[in-house]
Amino acid sequence: MDIKGTVLRIIRDIFRIGKVSSVNGTNCTVRVTFPDKDNLVSDELPIIVIGSYKTKGYWVPEVNTQVLCCFLPIISGVGLNKGFVLGGFYSVEDPPEETDPDVRCIKFPDGSFFRFDGKGTIHIHADKHLVLTAPRIDLN
């Protein structure tokens, strides 16, 4: 019995890299295709998010986003049915657009973006229009 090989196989079954093949925005879940498993498609997987109780973030990866998934160990008997999408990651195929570690930026396919430089400047660009709603807005 090759214990090292068995452990590596179990780890590869728990942590898997795949590509998002469909998105369910209502349930905040995705299906993921695993090319290394003959394009096997997962059940709908929940996405790990920032905040999920009173302060909530909403972000679902787009179709074709490369993601890292974590599945419950096979010994539980559930395989690719019970797991989570931990998130997307940069790669040669999908490199970051920013390289400054102080910058926080969200860019959208239409050209809109929100960028904070970490030094006090926030740049917001909306491709069509920008809506601000508040009882009072101060611009100086």
Identify the function of each model-found stretch.
Residues 1-133:
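Hydrophobic packing positions characteristic
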